[in-house]
């Protein structure tokens, strides 16, 4: 179970809608992923599509909870305004907060992010904060009262995987709120590693929506997240510099004994 604030989800995979080539394909991918929570960027959402059904109506039909986000915002003020508009339009106080430093790297502006999160928490929002892989920033976000910390594995859309696994593991070991890896996942093994490092969940969009076969990739991500979660619970063996035999050498017949 993934527990965030006052909600519980069976799936540890959160899927984003960005980059999908069609709503029909997006729907197939959402179902294949098993996700129960999905993000929608308010700034680029279209109320309806050529099919006539809005993405919000589709999510309600699929019984998938909606997580509006503030993608594209560059200041705390813009992020707060976007969150407030989303709450008014969608009747939800949940929001994924993104405040981007520039359009080239899409890395978080952590100063503006902290300001936005503090204001939104004070305004009654349940805040999930997209942030860098810096453990200090993660701790400060937790101090602000966010419901979940969402460090990046690598820059958005790069598919580079987890560039700093030590920091992700450190954030997980210190956090008392859920840690959800967000951004940079390229394939299933990246999602598995995130869970093995101690993350409570994985959020991804491009890895599925821009894959050659999005539905197949969505299914692989479903299994990858579960595999990583089970591996983390099972506990890996210690890493060693030298070989350790799995079977004892005692009782082995030797050539010398046969000759004698």
From Swiss-Prot:
Binding annotation for 1-deoxy-D-xylulose 5-phosphate: 157, 183-184, 205-206
Pfam families for the chain: ThiG
Catalytic center residues: 96
Enzyme Commission number(s) from the entry: 2.8.1.10
Domain of life assignment: Bacteria
GO molecular function: thiazole synthase activity
UniProt xrefs under InterPro entries: Aldolase_TIM, Thiazole_synthase_ThiG, ThiG
The reaction(s) this protein catalyses: [ThiS sulfur-carrier protein]-C-terminal-Gly-aminoethanethioate + 2-iminoacetate + 1-deoxy-D-xylulose 5-phosphate = [ThiS sulfur-carrier protein]-C-terminal Gly-Gly + 2-[(2R,5Z)-2-carboxy-4-methylthiazol-5(2H)-ylidene]ethyl phosphate + 2 H2O + H(+)
Keywords, sorted A to Z: Cytoplasm, Schiff base, Thiamine biosynthesis, Transferase
Cellular component aspect of the GO annotation: cytoplasm
Pathway: Cofactor biosynthesis; thiamine diphosphate biosynthesis
Gene3D superfamilies attached to this UniProt entry: Aldolase class I
Disulfide bond entries: none
Main location: cytoplasm
Keyword Mitochondrion: no
Annotated GO biological process: thiamine diphosphate biosynthetic process
Record has Cytoplasm as a keyword: yes
Protein's cellular compartments: Cytoplasm
Protein family (similarity comment): Belongs to the ThiG family.
Known function: Catalyzes the rearrangement of 1-deoxy-D-xylulose 5-phosphate (DXP) to produce the thiazole phosphate moiety of thiamine. Sulfur is provided by the thiocarboxylate moiety of the carrier protein ThiS. In vitro, sulfur can be provided by H(2)S.
Complex and partners: Homotetramer. Forms heterodimers with either ThiH or ThiS.
Entry protein name: Thiazole synthase
Organism lineage string: Bacteria, Bacillati, Actinomycetota, Actinomycetes, Mycobacteriales
Gene behind the chain: thiG
């Amino acid at each position: 179970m993934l527990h965030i604030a006052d909600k519980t989800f069976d799936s540890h995979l959160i899927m984003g809608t960005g980059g999908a080539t069609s709503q029909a394909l997006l729907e197939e991918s959402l179902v294949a992923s098993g996700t129960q929570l999905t993000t929608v960027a308010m700034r680029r959402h279209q109320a309806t599509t050529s099919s006539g059904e809005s993405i919000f109506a589709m999510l309600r039909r699929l019984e998938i909870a909606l997580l509006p986000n503030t993608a594209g915002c560059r200041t705390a003020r813009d992020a707060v305004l976007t969150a407030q508009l989303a709450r008014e339009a969608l009747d939800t106080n949940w929001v994924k907060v993104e405040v981007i430093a520039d359009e080239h790297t899409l890395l978080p502006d952590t100063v503006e992010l902290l300001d936005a999160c503090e204001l939104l928490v004070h305004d009654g929002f349940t805040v999930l904060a997209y942030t860098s892989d810096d453990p200090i920033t993660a701790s400060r976000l937790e101090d602000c009262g966010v419901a979940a910390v969402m460090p990046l594995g690598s820059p958005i859309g790069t598919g580079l995987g987890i560039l700093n696994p030590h920091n992700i593991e450190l954030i997980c070991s210190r956090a008392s709120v859920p840690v959800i890896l967000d951004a940079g996942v390229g394939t299933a093994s990246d999602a598995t590693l995130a869970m093995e490092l101690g993350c409570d969940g994985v959020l991804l969009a491009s890895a599925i929506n821009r894959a050659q076969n999005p539905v197949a990739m969505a299914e692989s991500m479903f299994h990858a997240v579960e595999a990583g979660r089970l591996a983390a619970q099972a506990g890996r063996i210690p890493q060693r510099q030298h070989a350790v035999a799995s079977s004892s050498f005692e009782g082995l017949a030797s050539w010398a004994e046969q000759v004698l």
